[in-house]
Amino acid sequence: DYINLSRHTSSLGYGVAGTYFIIKDLQAKLSYEKAYRLPTTDELFGDEDLEAGKTNLRPEQSDNVNFNLSYGRQFGKHGLYLEGSVIYRDTKDYIKRGLDAIGGMSYGIYENHGRVKTKGFNISLRYNYDRWFNIGGTFNNINARDDERYRAGNTLQESVSYGQRIPNQPYTFANFDANFAWHDLFREGNTLTIGYDGYYQHEFPLYWEALGDPTTKSRVPDQLSHNLVLGYSIKNGRYSFSLECRNFTNEKLYDNFSLQKAGRAFYGKFKVH
């Protein structure tokens, strides 16, 4: 048996954005938005595996400000692209992911947290040489902290997590890649590609940092993974195949549960267009 439940809510979201070229190749962007985020199906109902749903979640509402600078220019066969952004978010009813034990098993759970303020930045850099080679990467730092000063239901007692970093989510991470293409190899219209990409993620806490002994706290450790892919296409991409090795150094990688992911893995693909 089941019970039909329904909920109705309505909110007005809006935004405004502007852009200006400071010089020919240097562009500035500024935007503001009043945003609402509805809970996802996994957040509401779980995934029947490691996520436990919560049907009474409220939508997030936030005031977001973004400022971006980008510069891109070609110098003959050489291309350069730089981009930097800063963000500010003031979020109410923040949907926070945590961990809970249900029936002796640990599950991911979601709950609304009164208020969270987020400040962050990202920097991207990319260089390319003609059609042959490109290399680049992105660095991100997202500082989301509890801004709910007093405990829920108590207007006098200050929350021990006030001002603390939101747990169980990465806050410093980067990705980088390099790609080489050899056009018209063996025959016109055929291309050999060799690609590398990597990902770095700084350690982060599973629970509030203010709670418990700092020397015994559960943390998801630093992670650094490397992937390689070799591909060859024929007749301008009509036929193509690729071989890929993911995590080729066989590093220990973890998800937000601190559960270990699969190690070194190999994949092959063949396509006909």
Which residues does each predicted region cover?
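Signature of Gram-negative outer-membrane beta-barrel scaffolds
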Residues: D1-I23, L38, N143
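Membrane-embedded beta-barrel scaffold of Gram-negative outer-membrane proteins
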Residues: F21, Q27-S31, P59-K119, N140, ...
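Residue-level signature of outer-membrane beta-barrel architecture
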Residues: S10, G18-F21, K34, P59, ...
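Gram-negative outer-membrane beta-barrel transporters
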Residues: G79-D90, E111-P205, T249, K271
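C-terminal beta-signal and adjacent terminal beta-strands/loops
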Residues: Y36, K92, Y199-G212, T216-S225, ...
